[in-house]
Amino acid sequence: GTPCKCHGYIGVYWFMLAGCPDGYGYNLSCPYFLGICCVKK
């Protein structure tokens, strides 16, 4: 996915998702335009 920033971390942008997908170990997220930014801290 596309890199994105969330609370000072670099995360992955997921298009057209309301929440981060399970199984990737994400524990931080930020709402983004038409999607969400998910971060593994």
Curated annotation (Swiss-Prot):
Keyword Disulfide bond on entry: yes
Disulfide bonds: C4-C37, C6-C30, C20-C38
Residues of the signal peptide: none
Keyword Transcription regulation among UniProt keywords: no
Annotated keywords: Disulfide bond, Ion channel impairing toxin, Nematocyst, Proton-gated sodium channel impairing toxin, Secreted, Toxin
Database matches in SUPFAM superfamilies: Defensin-like
Protein's cellular compartments: Secreted; Nematocyst
Any matching Pfam family: Defensin_4
Extra facts: A synonymy between H.magnifica and R.crispa is controversial.
Protein function: Weakly and reversibly inhibits rat homomeric ASIC1 (isoform ASIC1a) (IC(50)=4.95 uM), and ASIC3 (IC(50)=17 uM). ASIC1a current inhibition and ASIC3 transient current inhibition are not complete, and reach a maximum of 70% inhibition and 80%, respectively.
Similarity comment: Belongs to the sea anemone type 3 (BDS) potassium channel toxin family.
UniProt protein name: Pi-stichotoxin-Hcr5c
Organism annotation: Radianthus crispa
